[in-house]
């Protein structure tokens, strides 16, 4: 049975964010701002339905989905694109595949104790973020 990811998580660290943003063709000005951010994550996990909120001083983003059901994700507030998205469980990792203009785009979340890990991919770039559960 997959873990319940419900909780509020504070940013701890990240690696390779600039490479990831470049792979998405994000402008230099927005990349500079994004690299300064320390976003929090809020996850509400109720059965197969999930809401993931990314919260920062620059921009917030919320995505809601049912695990295993493909949907159109509006990423215009993130990078100006839309894509077809499906989120599934692979063992104890929540895995997202985003099909659209950018190849090999997606993410995966998993827990290790009180730490939430996020791996973001786009093209050949991989960004790793770590968050600590605070409630």
UniProtKB/Swiss-Prot annotation:
Q: Which UniProt keywords apply?
A: Cytoplasm, Retinol-binding, Transport, Vitamin A
Q: Which GO terms describe its cellular component?
A: cytoplasm
Give the superkingdom in one word: Eukaryota
Q: Where in the cell is it found?
A: Cytoplasm
Relate the protein's function as given in its record.
Answer: Intracellular transport of retinol.
Q: Please give the PANTHER family that the UniProt record associates with this protein.
A: FATTY ACID BINDING PROTEIN
Know the name of this protein?
Retinol-binding protein 5
Q: What is its main location?
A: cytoplasm
Q: Which molecular-function annotation in GO is an example for this chain?
A: retinal binding
**Its family?**
Belongs to the calycin superfamily. Fatty-acid binding protein (FABP) family.
Q: What is known of its domains?
A: Forms a beta-barrel structure that accommodates hydrophobic ligands in its interior.
Q: Which Pfam families match?
A: Lipocalin
- The transmembrane segments are none
**Which cysteine pairs make disulfide bonds?**
none
């Amino acid at each position: 049975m997959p873990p319940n990811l419900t909780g509020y998580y504070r940013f701890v660290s990240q690696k390779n964010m600039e490479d990831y943003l470049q792979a998405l063709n994000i402008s230099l000005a927005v990349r500079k701002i994004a690299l300064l951010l320390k976003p929090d994550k809020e996850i509400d996990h109720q059965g197969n339905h999930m809401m993931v909120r990314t919260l920062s001083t620059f921009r917030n983003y919320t995505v809601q989905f049912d695990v295993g059901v493909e949907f159109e994700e509006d990423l215009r507030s993130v990078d100006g694109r839309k894509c077809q998205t499906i989120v599934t469980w692979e063992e104890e990792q929540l895995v997202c595949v985003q099909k659209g203009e950018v190849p090999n785009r997606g993410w995966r979340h998993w827990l290790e104790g009180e730490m939430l890990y996020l791996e973001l991919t786009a093209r050949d770039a991989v960004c790793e973020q770590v968050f600590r559960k605070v409630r």
